[in-house]
Amino acid sequence: MQDISTTTASTNYLKADGDTGAVFSITSQQQQIHYMRKQKPDHEKTREELIEEINHLRAVSNSNKNARIMLDEMYQFVALLDVNGNLLDVNEPALQGGGMIRSSIQGIPFWDCRWWATSQENIDNVREAVHKASKGEFIRYETEIFGKSAGTEKITIDFSLMPLFNDKGEVSLILPEGRNITEKRLGELEIERKNNELRSLYEKIKELDELKTQFFANVSHELRTPLALIVGPTDKLLKDENVDINVRKDLEIVARNARGLLKIVNNLLDISRLEAGKMNLNYSMVNLGQTVHLIASCFEILAREKSLDFSIITPSEPMMAAIDADKMQRVITNLISNAFKFTPSGGAVKCILEKFDLSPNKPGFQIVVSDTGPGIPDNLHEIIFERFRQVDGSSTRKHGGTGLGLSIVKEFVTLHGGTVTIHNISTGGAQFTLRLPLTPNMDEHLYKKTISDQNISEIQQQLYQQQQQEQQQQQQQQQNLQQPKLILNNIDNKYKINDDDNDDDDDDDDEDGLNFNILKKTNTSSDIASNALKDNMGSIMGVHAIAQQAVEELTEKQFYQSQENIHNKPIVLVVEDNPEMNRFIAELLSKYYFVVTAFDGVEGIEKTRAITPDLIVTDCMMPRMSGDEMVEQLRSDEQFDNIPILLLTAKADENLRIKLLQNGVSDYVNKPFSSEELVARVVNLMTMKKAKQFLQEELSSANTDLQELINQLTNKKRDLQTLVGELEKERNLLNNTNKSKDEFFMNLSHELRTPLNGILGWCQLLLYDIDSGGSSGGGSGSISGDDSTVRTGLETIERCASSQNQLINDLLDMSLIIGDKFSLILGDVDLPILIENAISSILVTAQSKKISVHSNIQGEGEEESSILRNIVGDKARLQQVIWNLLSNSIKFTKEKGRIHLNLKVVNQIPSREVLGFCSNPMFNTINRHGDRWILFTITDNGKGIPKQFLPSVFDRFKQADCSSTRSYGGLGIGLSITQNIIHLHKGAVYANSEGENKGSQFTVVLPIIKGSSSSNSSPSNQLSCSSSPPLIKKPFFSQPTNYINNNNNNNNNNNNNNNNNNNNNNNNNNNNNYNNYNNNNSNNNNNSNNNNNNNNNNNNNNNNNNNNNNNNNNNLNINNLINNNHNNNNNNYHHNNNNNNNSNNNEKLGKRQREEINNNENNNVDLRLRTPPPPPTSSISENFLVNSSNLIPSPALNPINNNNNSNNNNNNIGDIKKINLEISQIPSTNLNPKLSLVINNNNNNNNNNNSLLKTIITNAINNNINNSNNDDNSNNTTIPTPPSSAINMINSLPLPSPSPSFILPTLSPFSSPLSELKSSSNNNNNNNNNSNNNNNNSMSPNLRSPKANSNKNLLGGIQIMLVDDLEETTHLFSSMLYKLGAKRIDTFQRVSDAYAFLCDSSKPQPDIILSDLTMPFEDGYSMVRKLRDREKINTQNKKTPIIALTASVSSSDKEKVLKSGFDLHCSKPVNFLELSNSILTLIEKYNTTVNIDLIKEQEQNNNNNNNNNNNNNNNNNNNNNNINNGNDDDSLLLTDSRPCKKANSQ
């Protein structure tokens, strides 16, 4: 008890001192207890004792600390338990592995800790182990615990519990330990798994080996049976003396090869038995000397044939041994035959038999066989005895064999307990040494299993007695020997077959099926030999048979002897190393061919070169050179490349066959083969050879003839080359001519257009003066506007010049077609609009000839109409096609004729509608462009086309009447151009006529390709001002804002959206939008708007409301044309006439936006306003009426449902945000292109302020329809229907030209007022009737002259620079541009002068530059290049727009112009109105600004001037559509958001 308490106190002390409360060293603890027992009380201790005690305690404390450090650093698990199993302490690695804290587990049972929580079984095992350890038992076992990753992973430990005893031998503490053996355990498991796999694989291999052995045994047995049936009958026939000698030779070959095959089968069977461990030995007493002599005697003849020195050395006395005679005979025979095989002629072979003691107590013998052959390399001495191993295993080895002979020798010798070795002789050759015991060793385990004789001990005793007797006989020198007795178990006869072996021993027989027996010695050795020859012939014959077969294999066979080829048979070369196979093949083929033989590849090549055979039959594996090597070498020689080769191979390898065929082998035959197969293949190859040879001879003969032809062709080729050279010169000349022609056309265009420019320009200028009532030059030479003769003359000049310009354009188009340079620029096309515009362009000419034009072009149904209005094509070229066809119909139709136009969509082209001659014979309606088509047909009842001329109607320059008396002019290129345009659209044109004076019909067929966008054309910006037949662009309005439904009402259009509130300070906005299309005989439009308000701001559309102190803004929205036979428009206007009224008539378009850009082939911008054509469904003839009050647009512009009833439309129209303007070419005589709607408003004391007009009026009406008697209730009654009214209206319609046009970007006139066209006001007195009746009834595509009244101030405030080398051109341009309102024009005839002016900062800089391209010294390109370079260098300079003036119209030239830096391209002759609009557009584009304050001031002045002109008491309607009303108002309107610059008036 004292010890325990002491131990506890010591433990507590250690806890306090060590901070860990653990006891680490049991030894130090016990020493401390023992030390404390011997201590005195402290008061009895001396100073030295106290110091000693303190030092001792310090040492113990340090020891405990060191122990703690060592335990915590240990990798293994260590703890300390009391005898009850409670945990006292544990090292740090154990705590970390279990994820526990020391303080939480101290004092608890050890098995309740986290480590053992893997399973309840584990906890129970630990509890049981602790219980056993507390009784003093050491416990150790492997277990799994939670010991890794803070107690989350299991590990395997080698766990032990060691009890610790006190001095009394009692267990005081328990020490648990654990070593992590997880990896070791995993390794053991992996090793166990691998071992199991290896065990399984071994068993599998063992099983496969057994199966293989069994297979060899079965195959050997199966082979031996047919071989026995071959050998037996063959031997029987050979014994027959009546057999023919040739047959006997064949039978001998069969017997010989059968025995050889039997030997191979026996060897394979022996190998299988050896592998299976089932090879048994049949021991018998054998006289070794006699056996060796018998075997050697078989080789004596062979030795003489090969001139070999063959010697046999044996002991003089008999040497008896207990061996397996059969196997030993095979061993000796194999060694001797190998020596003969590898020893060359003249060499030596020696066989020595002698006694050799294997050990002092073990007598034996050795047989040494040596030769003088090549020997065996030292590195092969060990492996030469392996199975299938050969010194030379290649396909070119000289000696054959399977490689089993030496392997079987070693196996048989080893079974006898002997050894076989090999070494090379210093003089050359190899030496094999066999060493075997005379008697078998029964103590060895090997022979217990393999020896079959159970009485071998008796044989040993007999052999000993025999040796003793022989020694005695030698001493006595007796001549006769006593024969020993036979002692055999279970044998009664003297010579009996030993049946003591197993059943498998039957397979150990030799090739002849004989067994050797052990004889009991009763006589002398000589008697044994004689009796063996007499009584046991089987054994002796067996030895002789084995040796004789080996000799036969080595004996050279008889070769085939070739005879003389007296019959000139085809030669066959047979290359085969086996003499018998060589001879067999040669004799087989000699019946048909002359055969020559060779025995290896080298000899085969030599004989091939000597005789050049017709066919080669060769083996694959031969000595010196294999068959495939021989083939490869022959094929590399062109001389023998055509010789067919038949290859014989014993390898059934598919890859080898493919390789041989690739290397040039003609055919191959697998061994074994039948004679019929071999002959058939040889005959086939020989037949093919003969056929090939015959064809080659024929070819050679033909080559002779061909050579003559070649010579002739060579001469002709030489002549052709000469002609080709001349043609090349002609071609170059033609190319130069074409180039010169193109240059000529360009120069011609320039030279012709330059004078035309002057003619047309001055015509425009003079007509401008006539319209304005002024003069061209001022002074006395004034031209009166009333002089109709002068006007007629000028218009005639203008018309003729325009016709000349169109002729130039047609010729240039034809030049492009001929040069294959004609192309299209595709975009969205609205076909009905194109047709309507074309009809409008020919309307005057049709009326002059009283021709009625009917059309049906809108399509049936909404879907078809949508398709027709959105197809893909070249708009400009399609317009040209329509205009050409329509103008031809007008030309060739007599007066009062009829023309009908029809447009529709079809799924299939009906043959009844598409008649006549097709312009494209290859045209096919079933193609990849789609299954829907557009048919456009123009039918007339005119002159017609003669039947004989119909096929030539589309030929260029062809005309039906080419005589000098023809009635119709033209060049005959219009229809040719038409067909080329349609062909480029993948369509066709059909021309049909029943004959002369029976009318004609032209049908255009186009595939439908729907459009995807509104602008698919080239982005180039080019302006074309040239005149040509009408090119119709898209309508002015791309979409309507309001869709108007026409209902059946009483023909009243009440468009009053007015809130009339009779209160002060009210705003009454009356917005009346006239967008009505009336197709009725009579329409009464009554518009009554009476608004009387004080201090009100009334915005009334089409209403003149004059109130006291009112500001009336009358916003006119006029977008309409009426095509009615009789239209009665009653407009009741209630005018309150007061002084000082300020009427602002602002004409607005409503919520319509024009945002489309129409791109044509040459991308010219058409900024000219155009009035849509009349409705296509009406008859455009003499019944064409116009009323100026209500102008109704074409259905193409506004999709209105026409129910042939009156319209009741209530529409609220807003302000326009964008309008796109277009520039195109205007035919002159048909048109009076007024760009403003002039309505005569005659009011008394009214100020008409028409400023800030944010609109573009789409109708140009140049006639004031008689509106007399305008009272307060003004009634614009129905206008009579004189043709002059219609003609005057049509004359005001500006028509575009079909010439290609470049398109400008979208222009917004309300974003910048420079794009807004100005209108002029005609202020007249009461009851004035102003009718400008310009009746031009002839069709002529002329450029129209600008009208003075409407365009006087069109270019107000613009400064222009003009560069042209011709003085008359600069004079013309400056004169006309000044009249159009230009502020300043600086003209230069050289680029250098113009550029110097631009660089002078003191000079006024132009707003725009007009430059000719063709000028001396420096051209227009130099001008634009200098200008753009200057702008790039000095970015502060504003960019100045520049327009190119050129007479060239080719696409390449136009593209070059735009790429060079020009902004637009204007072709000569110039339409000055369009040029002016282009100038305004470009200035707007470059953000040119004008002082808006000045504009407002000038507008106020203009209003005052207008008030002074209206001093009558009558009610007149003055609707002025001009931005600037006054004489000198040249300012330009801008939006309020832009900066302003003041523009001085000219």
Curated annotation (Swiss-Prot):
GO terms for molecular function: ATP binding; phosphorelay sensor kinase activity. GO terms for biological process: sorocarp morphogenesis; sorocarp spore cell differentiation; sorocarp stalk cell differentiation. Residues 36-63 form a coiled coil. It holds the Pfam family HisKA. Residues 1013-1031, 1042-1146, 1313-1346, 1501-1526 have a biased composition (Low complexity). The keyword Repeat applies. InterPro entries: CheY-like_superfamily, HATPase_C_sf, His_kinase_dom, HisK_dim/P_dom, HisK_dim/P_sf, PAS, PAS-assoc_C, PAS-like_dom_sf. SUPFAM superfamilies: ATPase domain of HSP90 chaperone/DNA topoisomerase II/histidine kinase, CheY-like, Homodimeric domain of signal transducing histidine kinase, PYP-like sensor domain (PAS domain). Residues 1013-1148, 1266-1285, 1313-1350, 1500-1546 are annotated as: Disordered. The modification 4-aspartylphosphate is found at D619, D1412. This is Hybrid signal transduction histidine kinase D. The gene is dhkD.
